[in-house]
Each structure stands twice: as C-alpha cells, then as structure tokens.
C-alpha cells in the first residue's frame, strides 16, 4: 500500500493501522522521482482523488491518499482544505496554530469554538473506480496549545468534552478515535468488496 504523502507523522498513523492487516506501507519518500501533485481542488475529495489517481497511474500501484483538515464552525469551515497552508505556503505547524488562535481571538466561549477534524480517504488502483470514504472528529479549539504528541493542530484541538487535546493522547489512543481512524474503519468495511470488483 503506497500512501500518497511525504509526511512521516501521517505515515506512522497509517502504518500502525495497516501493519495489523498485513500490508506493507510505503510513502512518497520511497519514490523521490515522483512529481509533487498540486492540491488544486476546492474540496477534500477533489484533492485526495488528484493525489491517489495521479500517483496510481504513474506507479501502477494501489495508492491511498488522504486529504485532511480542520473545519472551525465560527470561521465558516476554515481553514478547511487550506489547513496545511493557513498561515501561507510553507507555513510551519506553529505558524498555522498561531494564525488560528489569532482568528479566534475574539471568540471567548469554548462552546463557540467548535470544530471538526475531517478526513477524506481515496484508494486508487489502475483500471478501477476509486473508493472514497469520509469521517469527522468533533471537538473544540483551545485558547492555547497543550500536549507534546501528534502534529498539525493537535495541540489546540480539544477532544469532544474531555478537556484533553489530541496532542495529549498516545498514538494508540488517537488511532482508536481520530478522524483518520474513523475513516480507515469505514474504509476497511468496504475495502474487501471494492478490491474484489473486476477492473474497468
């Protein structure tokens, strides 16, 4: 299974899930000659499809791509598909987190800072209709970062009503409940029947 990312944090989460199923997980760092796929889509699904289908065509392999992001209700769903570059192209996690806190500076009640981490997964294979699943993980945006684990907006994302940030969860805890874990769970329910479908 080739994961269409160079992000080792994301790969680690997928590897923890797919290892148990007997899949050997690679990522784009194993294929340095592959071109970068521009994420020009306006939705998570468009971006995930672009990555999965382009890389599958180039390599002839089964490819899993995800497009994930944070949707903050009071910001109309932003940062959304721009989550990784919310503070600008090439922005660090710290810069994106600072920008988000700045955007929410006048939102004083935690209940008004509701948000969802969203994942769309697309599996593409040569000559097959792509498989698409989506999932959300609901919570709130904290007033300051806390926790040392995870990546991205994890230090700001309070999980449900627990008061814990997703950066305070162990990888095992996160993989049992995160948006990515929920999407993978859905994927695993439909993957066997998709895999057994004849090619186009």
UniProtKB/Swiss-Prot annotation:
GO process annotations (BP): nucleoside triphosphate catabolic process; nucleotide metabolic process; purine nucleoside triphosphate catabolic process
Pfam families documented for this protein: Ham1p_like
Catalytic residues of the enzyme: 67 (proton acceptor)
EC number: 3.6.1.66
GO molecular function, one term: ITP diphosphatase activity
Binding-site residues for substrate, renumbered to this chain: 5-10, 68, 151-154, 174, 179-180
Keyword list, A-Z: Hydrolase, Magnesium, Metal-binding, Nucleotide metabolism, Nucleotide-binding
Keyword GTP-binding attached: no
InterPro entries according to UniProt: dITP/XTP_pyrophosphatase, ITPase-like_fam, RdgB/HAM1
Binding-site positions, Mg(2+): 67
Family the entry assigns: Belongs to the HAM1 NTPase family.
Subunit organization: Homodimer.
Name the UniProt record assigns to this protein: dITP/XTP pyrophosphatase
Source organism of this protein record: Streptococcus pneumoniae (strain ATCC BAA-255 / R6)
């Amino acid at each position: 299974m080739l994961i269409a990312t160079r992000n080792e944090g994301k790969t680690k989460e997928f590897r923890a899930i797919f290892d148990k199923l007997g899949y050997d997980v690679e990522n784009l760092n194993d294929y340095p000659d592959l071109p970068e796929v521009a994420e020009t889509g306006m939705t998570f699904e468009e971006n995930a499809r672009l990555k999965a289908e382009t890389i599958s065509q180039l390599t002839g392999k089964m490819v899993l791509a995800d497009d994930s992001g944070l949707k903050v209700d009071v910001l109309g769903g932003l940062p959304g598909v721009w989550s990784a570059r919310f503070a600008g192209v090439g922005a660090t996690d710290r810069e994106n987190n600072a920008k988000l806190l700045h955007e929410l500076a006048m939102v004083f009640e935690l209940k008004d800072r509701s948000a969802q981490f969203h994942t769309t997964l697309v599996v593409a294979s040569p000559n097959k209709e792509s498989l698409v699943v989506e999932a959300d993980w609901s919570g709130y945006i904290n007033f300051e970062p806390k926790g040392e684990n995870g990546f991205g907006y994890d230090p700001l994302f309070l999980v449900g009503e627990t008061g814990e940030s997703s950066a305070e969860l162990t990888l095992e805890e996160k993989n049992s409940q995160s948006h990515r874990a929920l999407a993978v769970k859905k994927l695993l329910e439909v993957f066997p029947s998709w895999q057994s479908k004849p090619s186009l």
